[in-house]
């Protein structure tokens, strides 16, 4: 076993200390380059999403107003229109229709996801309404399940009630809301604004996907919504 004596001017110890310093310096430079590369990558992604607003500065300016006679004088205050325009551009960047035209499987999955989201939304909404009126929801669930099955949605039957396998939230809303929140977080401070942006996101998505239903036997989201509403209204009107 080698015994190390800690003398102040021991050459061996000094040499062992300087070598790691060079390695550490090299590692530090390499890490800095990696961090810079990642940072530049995300800057490019963000620039791509906001490109429309940079190239159309005049349009954006017309959708803002300014505080005058205060500390914030001259600073643009964003309006809902600017945020909604950004969400619309984000939807165009996702390019649902373009992807669907190139990939039939993607188109089919998109149609099923959209109609399943419509089913989930209105099932919950009308179940709560029927329950509040003291109406048994079992027949309603059975009938809207049959409507979903007739619309061509895949799913499973349990206790004589069909449920679409993809029932859940609209999968395209989250990307729009997340992108808008990341760019304009101060526009999502109130529940009213959040709800307004969610409604708008759903509206433009439903409009965007309509052409995907033109070449198949499935009802459009709007038609399927009307089918569910008609079923619910029948139970409400026939309630004692």
From Swiss-Prot:
Provide this UniProt record's keywords sorted from A to Z.
GTPase activation, Guanine-nucleotide releasing factor, Secreted, Virulence
Q: Name one GO molecular function term.
A: GTPase activator activity
Q: List every stretch annotated GEF catalytic domain.
A: 78-240
Stored SUPFAM superfamilies: SopE-like GEF domain
What is a single cellular component term in the Gene Ontology annotation?
extracellular region
Q: Where in the cell is it found?
A: Secreted
Superkingdom as given in the UniProt entry? Bacteria
Write out the function statement from the record: Activator for both CDC42 and RAC1 by directly engaging these Rho GTPases and acting as potent guanine nucleotide exchange factor (GEF). This activation results in actin cytoskeleton rearrangements and stimulates membrane ruffling, promoting bacterial entry into non-phagocytic cells.
The note filed under miscellaneous reads: Encoded within a lambda-like prophage region with similarity to GIFSY phages.
Protein name in the entry:
Guanine nucleotide exchange factor SopE
* Source organism (scientific name): Salmonella hadar
The organism's lineage is:
Bacteria, Pseudomonadati, Pseudomonadota, Gammaproteobacteria, Enterobacterales
Gene behind this chain?
sopE
């Amino acid at each position: 076993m080698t015994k190390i004596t800690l003398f102040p001017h021991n050459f061996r110890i000094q040499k062992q200390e300087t070598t790691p310093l060079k390695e550490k310096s090299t590692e530090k430079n390499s890490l800095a380059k990696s961090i810079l590369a990642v940072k530049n990558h995300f800057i490019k992604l963000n620039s791509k999403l906001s490109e429309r607003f940079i190239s159309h500065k005049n349009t954006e300016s017309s959708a803002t107003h300014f505080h005058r006679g205060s500390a914030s004088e001259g600073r643009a205050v964003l309006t809902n229109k600017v945020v909604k325009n950004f969400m619309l551009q984000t939807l165009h960047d996702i390019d649902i229709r373009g992807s669907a035209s190139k990939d039939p499987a993607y188109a089919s999955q998109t149609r099923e996801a959209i109609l399943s989201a419509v089913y989930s939304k209105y099932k919950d909404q009308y179940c709560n309404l029927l329950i509040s009126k003291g109406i048994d929801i079992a027949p309603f669930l059975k009938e809207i399940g049959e409507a979903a099955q007739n619309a061509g949605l895949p799913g499973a039957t349990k206790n004589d009630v069909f449920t679409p396998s993809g029932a859940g939230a609209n999968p395209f809303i989250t990307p729009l809301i997340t992108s808008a929140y990341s760019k304009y977080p101060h526009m999502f401070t109130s529940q009213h604004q959040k709800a307004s942006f969610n409604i708008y996101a759903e509206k433009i998505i439903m409009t965007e996907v309509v052409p995907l239903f033109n070449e198949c036997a499935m009802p459009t989201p709007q038609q399927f919504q009307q089918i569910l509403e008609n079923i619910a209204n029948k139970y409400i009107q026939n309630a004692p």
